[in-house]
Design a protein with these regions (language model features):
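N-terminal non-catalytic structural scaffold regions of very large proteins
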Residues: 1-177
């Protein structure tokens, strides 16, 4: 794997996070099955629950890999890209920017850091050391699956089409890009 070949730079990661934001994709829909936290086994939300913004944030930050929601014709499985807010796992962290965290972090790497380090100071050092893995600049497997999932469910009214002719979708390309 060559990370430079699949480098998204800052703009690409921003677009992935914006488009595949798990919580924005499920707000306003009804769950068709219970949502269970994979780490604790706790039921986070029961079936027939209307997903509010607060519940959607909770589900995303709990690193739930998917939820089932009710569509007009059938159940729809919405996949997560497993990007979470670090403050959910380190509530004593006042300013994530002091560690170099400026956006959502990749949960599998964060989980490994939390398991291997016991004290807050050790965890902060590990986060600084592994910041490039926590905030990947390349496409992850979960990104690919969530992208395919997003595109498949456009026909069911989940998500929205991009206007490719919109001037906001233009950018200047640097030399050598």
């Amino acid at each position: 794997f060559d990370p430079r070949r699949y480098d998204l730079a800052k703009v690409g990661r921003y677009k992935f996070n914006k488009k595949l934001h798990f919580n924005k994709r499920i707000v306003g829909h009804k769950l068709s099955q219970d949502v269970v936290d994979t780490t604790t086994g706790e039921i986070l939300a029961e079936a027939e629950t209307l997903v509010t913004r607060e519940l959607a944030d909770t589900l995303q930050n709990s690193a739930v890999p998917y939820v089932w929601i009710q569509g007009e014709e059938r159940e729809i499985k919405v996949l997560s890209s497993l990007m979470v807010d670090i403050r959910h796992y380190l509530p004593e962290l006042e300013d994530p920017k002091s560690l170099g965290v400026t956006e959502l972090v990749y949960y599998p790497v964060l989980e490994k850091i939390l398991e291997e380090n016991d004290t807050f100071e050790d965890r902060c050092e590990a986060i600084k050391r592994d910041i490039h893995d926590l905030i990947p600049k390349h496409i992850t497997k979960e990104d690919i699956l969530a992208s395919i999932n997003y595109n498949m469910h456009l026909e069911y009214g989940l998500g929205n089409d991009d206007d490719i002719d919109h001037l906001g979708n233009r950018r200047i390309r640097a030399v050598g890009e």
